[in-house]
Amino acid sequence: MFKESLDTGRTSTFWKGNEYCFTTGQFAKLDRAYRKHCGPTAITNLVYTLAGKEGKPLSEKPEAVFRRIAGIGGKRLIYMNTDFLKLFGGTSDILVPFMIRRSLRTFGITGYSVRGPFPATARRICAELDRGAIVYLEVHRHPVYGNHHMLCYGYTVRDGRLMLRMADGWVGRVHDLPAGEELFALCTVISRQKG
């Protein structure tokens, strides 16, 4: 953990009040049933959050938006709706930025850059959040989530401990997740384009 970020009270809350937190449970039984669909769920949260922040809320129901996003990933083999042998399926860590870009274009959300994936360190996550970005976080072998994709909207430091403001796709509200470097894998950064 990096020392300069551990000042108690330090926060990044640019997105507070605009965060969406749909869950995988809301979409699991759609169509033929979705499996390993945390990636499309996180991107659905992202699309709703950015559209709301831009003052152009989506008129489509979340289920319709989710289906379109899962379809975008499925057509490009970025998202596979399978859980073959509990090993294969879900959203590709490396290709998720392409799925995010295409999803934003599909819903008319412009003016944002999608960069990554990068190694997800506390320093990088906090620096990007301080710049007003949203961080799409991918964790591997997490003690609670296992392999999982979710959104990070901000952070706070309490008692020297970094707490990330997460839409984890499991809980229908934003909540704080204690951060430890060993828990992070990759991150993709979604931020306002400069100029």
Q: Model regions: which residues?
A:
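Stable alpha-helical elements in mature extracytoplasmic
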Residues: 34, 39-46, 96-100, 121, ...
